[in-house]
Amino acid sequence: GDPDQLPSVGAGNVLGDLLRSGVVPAVSLTEIFRQAEKSAIIRNAHAVNLGQSPELKNTQNDFFFLCRRAPDRLVQTVVELCQKRLPENMGIPADQIQVLSPTRKGVCGTVNLNRALQAALNPPAASKRQKPWGDMVFREGDRVMQTRNNYDVVWERDDGAMGAGIFNGDVGVIQEIDP
């Protein structure tokens, strides 16, 4: 496990408790392979772990901070970043960007952000089927994330691989909606 990741959602802290007990052998890895050595993400993560403030003024690298006080302006900025600015300025395709929000409700919550991003990145088209679900609309081409474990779903990939179960955090793209 990673001691710097978010804690468990449910009760308990099994991994942390086991490591602190000293009963289970543990090794700490110090070399980072996911980001480049000169990554501002890495530098700022280390700074935060040491109780220091991250560098927020440099917007020319892989870590930057944009202050938005009005919630509507924040949503507009997120849409601009995903639709135009990150793909054009950093070469990151929109389908590789993940937006995190600490809440579901409100102007800046996941429900509203998802609606705004869907309208910008995957608008309705005659060639795309869609399905209303409660107060949401799912559309072919939408990126989706599973929010609860479902062990009973049987799935098949394009390459023929099959399996059962989809799990909290699994991400995919809606390929087809049955008529």
Q: Over which residues does each language-model region extend?
A:
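Conserved helicase motor core of P-loop NTPases
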Residues: 3-164
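Conserved beta-strand and immediately adjacent loop positions that scaffold enzyme active sites
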Residues: 98, 171-173
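Conserved beta-strand residues within beta-sheet cores
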Residues: 143, 168-171
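A generic structural signal for residues embedded in beta-strands
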Residues: 146, 174-177
